[in-house]
């Protein structure tokens, strides 16, 4: 239990940050799943469009330090390679 006003405030902030970060991580996972689903259908145009949107989400999450920049680069690289392989 937080004993000081500062500790109570930090506990509140931690809960708020946790909710926000969880939301962003969920958004990231959803974007990646959408790209994989469009790749599975074999539609190169749809896959390219979902990849573009997912890249934006991945970069946004990495900029906010929710995931490491190298993990973001790895996700983007692998998804782009999978979309390119559809050709």
Curated annotation (Swiss-Prot):
InterPro entries documented for this protein: Ribosomal_bS20, Ribosomal_bS20_sf
The organism's place on the tree of life at top rank: Bacteria
Region of interest called Disordered, as start-end residue ranges on this chain: 1-25
Keyword terms: Ribonucleoprotein, Ribosomal protein, RNA-binding, rRNA-binding
Keyword Amino-acid biosynthesis: no
GO biological process, one term: translation
Record family assignment: Belongs to the bacterial ribosomal protein bS20 family.
Annotated protein name in UniProt: Small ribosomal subunit protein bS20
Lineage: Bacteria, Pseudomonadati, Pseudomonadota, Betaproteobacteria, Burkholderiales
